[in-house]
Design a protein with these regions (language model features):
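Phosphate-moiety recognition in structured ligand-binding domains
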Residues: 174-235
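Active-site phosphate/pyrophosphate-binding segments
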Residues: 36, 40-46, 50, 56-139, ...
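Glycine-rich phosphate-binding loops that contact phosphosugars or nucleotide phosphates
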Residues: 1-69, 74, 78, 159-189
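Predominant activation on well-ordered alpha-helical scaffold segments within soluble catalytic domains
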Residues: 51-56, 120-127, 170-173, 205-213
Length: 235
């Protein structure tokens, strides 16, 4: 509903619009000047890839830079890396999910380009799909409040990238580890196979999905079950 209204308002204001959707029969497809129908089930990865393609092409035209070419080159390597993560991370995700299932809540911490993924996993996935109470914290703001709750029994999930913000997230992680052992870390340096730092949201997404899937199952909760979402209750 909100996306359709946004497209209508954008067109009314004279903006050129592109509707990005998994299926051409989606209502938003009729509202865009152009449609990108990606036809894939993994919508978060697909949305990221489309967004990166738009931004890369725009920047190449208005402000060419060698770093843009590095990102574009590494995008072609991404399918192979993701396939290996899908095949190789299930058991690790199962073990981590079982561990986290004993915690009543979970704080997700990240910085830089991983902050949107931290929101997606720490808010959307944990709350909607696993019914786990939690919050998403910006590592850059960790010392301004969140550090006060670090103590034994308080669990944290950290996402570490390889960009310039790594120092900020690592500093928060080091502090937390001095006060609690209930910490899980997903690190692009360990799983990203050397891909560009700005592709970290795409690589970390796969292990996090395995983790959240098994977290839900170990809590005896069907991740597809909803009480209110999708028109089940008035909102």
């Amino acid at each position: 509903e909100e996306v359709c209204l946004a497209l209508e308002k954008a067109k009314a204001a004279g903006a050129y619009t592109v509707a990005v959707t998994g299926r051409e029969e989606n209502p938003i497809a009729a509202l865009g000047d152009r449609v990108v129908a990606y036809g894939a089930e993994c919508i978060w990865e697909a949305h990221l890839l489309v967004a990166y393609a738009f931004v890369l092409e725009f920047l190449r035209r208005v402000a060419p830079h060698p770093e843009l070419e590095r990102i574009a080159a590494d995008l072609t390597k991404l399918p192979g890396v993701l396939a290996r993560l899908v095949a190789g991370w299930e058991e690790k995700g199962r073990a981590l999910g079982e561990r986290a299932s004993r915690w009543p809540f979970l704080y997700t911490v990240a910085a830089g380009p991983l902050k949107p993924l931290a929101y997606k996993e720490g808010i959307v996935t944990l709350l909607e799909f696993t019914w786990t109470h939690g919050s998403c914290l910006d590592a850059a703001e960790f010392r301004h409040g969140p550090l006060e709750v670090a103590e034994p029994g308080v669990p944290f999930l950290f996402l570490l990238g390889t960009d310039e913000s790594r120092h900020t997230a690592q500093r928060a992680l080091d502090f937390v580890r001095r006060h609690t052992d209930d910490v899980i870390v997903f690190d692009h340096r360990e799983i990203g196979e050397g891909l560009h730092p700005w592709l970290a949201p795409m690589t970390l997404f796969v292990p996090l999905e395995w983790f959240c899937y098994y977290l839900s199952l170990h809590k005896d909760h069907n991740p597809d079950h909803r009480r209110y979402y999708g028109g089940l209750a008035e909102y």
